[in-house]
Amino acid sequence: MQCDLTGAQILRPGGLVPDVVSLSDGVFVETPQNRRIDLSGYWVLPGIIDLHGDGFERHLAPRRGAVRNLGAGLVATEAELAANGITTAVLAQFYSWEGGMRSPEFALAFLSAWSNMAGQFDTDLSVQLRFETHMLDHYTQFYDLVRRFQVRYVVFNDHVPHQALAVGKKPPRLT
């Protein structure tokens, strides 16, 4: 699509100013285009980048244990992000001993759904995979998952409740 966005307030380094923005094939260009779109009364702002999102989980499972179609959940996630001006998002997915949506099995299912949806998103959705460091028996499996799905952002976590363990408590998932 080639067009000029006219009549809007454009956010520039000095603030909002009335200006014209020209686009060609999704890229800002200097050369005016033939088609004009009047955006009088609107603002043109840059997209927001969310580098660590975990609010998307409610779209994958509307309530605890109610995991449905992960692809549909990703579509709903993207729609909410876009509606809020987020054009680039990193979805933070656990790979943990904590189970449920944080389990290695769920991480695989999530990454599979995300990979199957590749190319269908209008926003830039990537994944941050959060690995629990105490899962020593899983390092090779985790590495293979990262390579298989080309995950570019990995975080190493330690969610072991050290203080509780120090006073003799043992959380159910650690028994």
Task: Locate each region found by the language model.
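Metal-associated gating/positioning segment near the N- to mid-region
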Residues: W43-A109
